């Protein structure tokens, strides 16, 4: 998200162009079902319990680009008779994560005993361990369900302050937390309703936030 928002001239064409390319090939070669990986950013500011049919009002460029990808998916589906599913993950983290994403960044600071900077520690994110996200996406791809959207998340949002405190506790760090206020780049978020995925896909996240963070920390230690 950050890359697209900071460099939209290059970032937006990659998101939309890649999606269009994949959709064209999916239609051209008779793909059984196209699964589009969108983002919770398409909702913009949202509260706990947000469902898939809730209003989509992105507050940043990345969210708008992903929402455009959703619209393109539906247009190709209507034009070419392509079955599709839209998956909206949130705050995915875990082994192999990019270093500038929030969980990776907090771990890096904690391991180095450096201050962890928050942009509004009360803002929440429905952090989802990567194995749960992958599990949900595979469930969606292999299901007989088509032509709808799913929130694939942990279904339990956590504040950035709690995230930082938990990482400090897991790592035994001496880091201090500094809250410098809200960034306009990111929306106010909460818990996404995953009942549709539970009912139709039998999706059930397996990792609590702490379990996911501990697993990620084990991986980071072995990597170091």
Model-predicted segments: where are they?
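Active-site Tyr-X1-5-Lys
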Residues: 45, 57-85, 111
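C-terminal "lid/loop" region of Rossmann-like NAD(P)-dependent oxidoreductases
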Residues: 120, 147-150, 159-164, 172-189, ...
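NAD(P)H-binding glycine-rich loop region in Rossmannoid oxidoreductase-like domains
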Residues: 1-14
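A conserved pocket-lining segment of Rossmann-fold NAD(P)-dependent short-chain dehydrogenase/reductase
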Residues: 4-5, 84-91, 106-128, 151-153
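Glycine/proline-rich active-site loop of Rossmann-fold NAD(P)-dependent oxidoreductases
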Residues: 67, 92-105, 112-114, 130-131, ...
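Flexible, glycine-rich beta-alpha linker
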Residues: 43-44, 60-61, 85-102
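Conserved Rossmann-fold NAD(P)-dependent oxidoreductase catalytic core, especially the SDR/UDP-sugar
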Residues: 20-61
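Amphipathic terminal alpha-helices
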Residues: 209-224
């Amino acid at each position: 998200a950050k890359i697209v928002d900071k460099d939209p001239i290059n970032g937006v064409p990659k998101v939309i162009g890649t999606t269009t390319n994949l959709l064209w090939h999916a239609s051209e070669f008779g793909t059984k079902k196209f699964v589009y990986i969108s983002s919770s950013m398409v909702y913009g500011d949202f509260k706990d319990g947000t469902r898939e049919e809730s209003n989509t009002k992105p507050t940043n460029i990345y969210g708008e680009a992903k929402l455009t990808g959703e619209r393109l998916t539906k247009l190709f589906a209507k034009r070419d008779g392509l079955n599709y599913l839209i998956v909206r993950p949130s705050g995915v983290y875990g082994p192999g994560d990019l270093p500038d994403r929030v969980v990776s960044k907090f771990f890096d600071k904690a391991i180095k005993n450096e201050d962890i900077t928050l942009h509004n520690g009360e803002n929440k994110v429905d952090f989802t361990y990567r194995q749960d996200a992958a599990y949900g996406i595979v469930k969606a791809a292999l299901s007989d369900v088509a032509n709808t959207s799913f929130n694939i998340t942990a279904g339990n949002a956590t504040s950035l302050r709690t995230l930082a405190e938990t990482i400090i506790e897991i790592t035994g760090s001496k880091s201090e937390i500094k809250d410098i206020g809200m960034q306009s780049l990111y929306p106010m978020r909460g818990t996404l309703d995953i009942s549709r995925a539970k009912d139709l896909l039998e999706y059930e996240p397996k990792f609590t936030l702490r379990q996911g963070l501990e697993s990620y920390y084990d991986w980071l230690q072995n990597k170091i």
